[in-house]
């Protein structure tokens, strides 16, 4: 069927991309924009751009990934990864309000890491009370004791 054929073709283009054929990223974007292979390639591309400290270009790639994975028929896992990476870039450039905005979709999420990220951004904005609430939610959500301790340290630094 058509979907299977598209998946096979996207897989072949993705494998060529992994072998170093950068023009295949454009082919993936243009010919298979909603394919999981395209999403993986975009995530990989953003990582490479960040390694080269090209944050603006990485943001553009991640925003494209976010847009193509959004919605009812989107890919929620890739969308969440895109949003996390976008938020982390915004945190690193002190664009705290943009970090909070990109994470807003997950404000009721049970993922403690999302609460921790949002708390970091809120702290940067000077919204201490909301940051404390988010850190508390992260602490409650983490089962790993070392992660809890890290967030507890962040919380104690906010309270100083």
What are the roles of these predicted feature ranges?
Residues 51, 92, 124, 157-160:
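Register position in tetratricopeptide repeats
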Residues 12-19, 31, 48, 89, ...:
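Residue-level signature for tetratricopeptide repeat
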Residues 132-160:
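Terminal, low-structured helical/coil segments at or just beyond the last alpha-helical repeat
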Residues 2, 27-36, 64-74, 104-110, ...:
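Solenoid-like repeat scaffolds
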Residues 43-113:
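Alpha-helical adaptor scaffolds
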Residues 33-38, 73-78, 110-113, 117, ...:
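Structural signature of alpha-solenoid helical repeat junctions
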């Amino acid at each position: 069927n058509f979907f299977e054929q598209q998946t096979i073709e996207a897989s072949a283009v993705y494998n060529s991309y992994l072998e170093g054929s950068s023009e295949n990223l454009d082919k993936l974007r243009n010919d298979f924009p909603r394919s999981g292979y395209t999403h993986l390639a975009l995530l990989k591309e953003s990582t490479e751009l960040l390694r080269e400290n090209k944050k603006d270009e990485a943001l553009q790639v991640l925003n494209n990934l976010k847009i193509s994975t959004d919605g009812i028929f989107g890919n929620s896992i890739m969308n969440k990864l895109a949003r996390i990476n976008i938020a982390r870039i915004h945190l690193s450039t002190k664009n705290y309000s943009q970090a909070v905005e990109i994470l807003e979709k997950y404000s009721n999420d049970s993922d403690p890491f999302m609460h921790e990220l949002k708390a970091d951004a809120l702290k940067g904005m000077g919204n201490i009370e909301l940051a404390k609430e988010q850190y508390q939610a992260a602490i409650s959500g983490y089962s790993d004791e070392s992660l809890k301790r890290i967030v507890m340290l962040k919380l104690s630094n906010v309270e100083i």
